[in-house]
């Protein structure tokens, strides 16, 4: 399984997301249950490197480590920029083990 490292974030919204993107990062969210979600930030370069090396990346389960807590997730949705090769946002869905 692939491993991705992320950092939890406390500031959410348009302004905070724009600041992240200026730092070459992007916001993401882990849907844990119907009630709770975890907001995280990921590195644009790290994610693109993983994406380019693994063709089955979108179909397989991924280990996502956020602040030393391990989640097994699947990608639910990716939002990309219209003409740049940048990711704007990703939704992850936690897989129950």
UniProtKB/Swiss-Prot annotation:
Keywords annotated in UniProt: Ribonucleoprotein, Ribosomal protein, RNA-binding, rRNA-binding
Gene3D superfamilies: Ribosomal Protein L25, Chain P
A Pfam family reported for this protein in Swiss-Prot or TrEMBL: Ribosomal_L25p
Gene Ontology cellular-component terms listed: ribonucleoprotein complex; ribosome
Source taxon at top rank: Bacteria
Gene Ontology terms for molecular function: 5S rRNA binding; structural constituent of ribosome
UniProt GO BP: translation
Function noted in UniProt: This is one of the proteins that binds to the 5S RNA in the ribosome where it forms part of the central protuberance.
Subunit structure, as described in the record: Part of the 50S ribosomal subunit; part of the 5S rRNA/L5/L18/L25 subcomplex. Contacts the 5S rRNA. Binds to the 5S rRNA independently of L5 and L18.
Protein family: Belongs to the bacterial ribosomal protein bL25 family.
Name of the protein described by the UniProt record: Large ribosomal subunit protein bL25
């Amino acid at each position: 399984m692939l491993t991705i490292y992320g950092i939890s974030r406390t500031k959410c919204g348009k302004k905070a997301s724009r600041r992240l993107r200026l730092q070459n990062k992007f916001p993401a969210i882990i849907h844990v249950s119907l009630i709770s979600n975890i907001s995280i930030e990921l590195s644009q370069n790290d994610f693109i490197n993983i994406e380019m090396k693994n063709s089955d990346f979108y179909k397989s389960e991924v280990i996502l480590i956020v602040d030393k807590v391990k989640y097994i997730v699947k990608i639910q949705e990716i939002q990309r920029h219209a003409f740049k090769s940048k990711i704007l946002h990703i939704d992850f869905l936690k897989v129950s083990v």
